[in-house]
Amino acid sequence: MYAIVKTGGKQYKVSEGDVLFVEKLEANAGDVVTLNEVLACSKDGELKLGSPVVEGASVQAKVVEQGKAKKVIVFKYKAKKDYRRKQGHRQSYTKIVVEKINA
């Protein structure tokens, strides 16, 4: 059984027990979050497609940790003009474990 869920503007194919790194969710470590935007779900070989979401379907996941990804360096310059800008960015993420798919 699997489901396609949308969170943080991205889509993920999940099964029970999967570990995901998603865009930051407002929850603490140990909390259970419910992802209601289920775009499709498959159970016993039968695929349900939503338009845009599957009615009554949800995915429950447990928050393992909140964190930040590795730093990405953004460097802008203009040749021969002595113009240089260096900036770093660390994206926040939430690590979750899928516990249950309700279809």
From Swiss-Prot:
Keyword Ribonucleoprotein in record: yes
Keywords carried by this UniProt record: Ribonucleoprotein, Ribosomal protein, RNA-binding, rRNA-binding
Any one GO biological process: translation
CC per GO annotation: cytoplasm; ribonucleoprotein complex; ribosome
Any Pfam family the entry gives: Ribosomal_L21p
Database matches in PROSITE patterns: RIBOSOMAL_L21
The keyword rRNA processing appears for this protein: no
GO molecular function, one term: rRNA binding
InterPro entries cross-referenced by the UniProt entry: bL21-like (IPR028909), bL21-like_sf (IPR036164), Ribosomal_bL21 (IPR001787), Ribosomal_bL21_CS (IPR018258)
Role description: This protein binds to 23S rRNA in the presence of protein L20.
Family, similarity comment: Belongs to the bacterial ribosomal protein bL21 family.
Subunit structure, interactors included: Part of the 50S ribosomal subunit. Contacts protein L20.
Name this protein carries in UniProt: Large ribosomal subunit protein bL21
Organism: Clostridioides difficile (strain 630) (Peptoclostridium difficile)
Native organism taxonomy: Bacteria, Bacillati, Bacillota, Clostridia, Peptostreptococcales
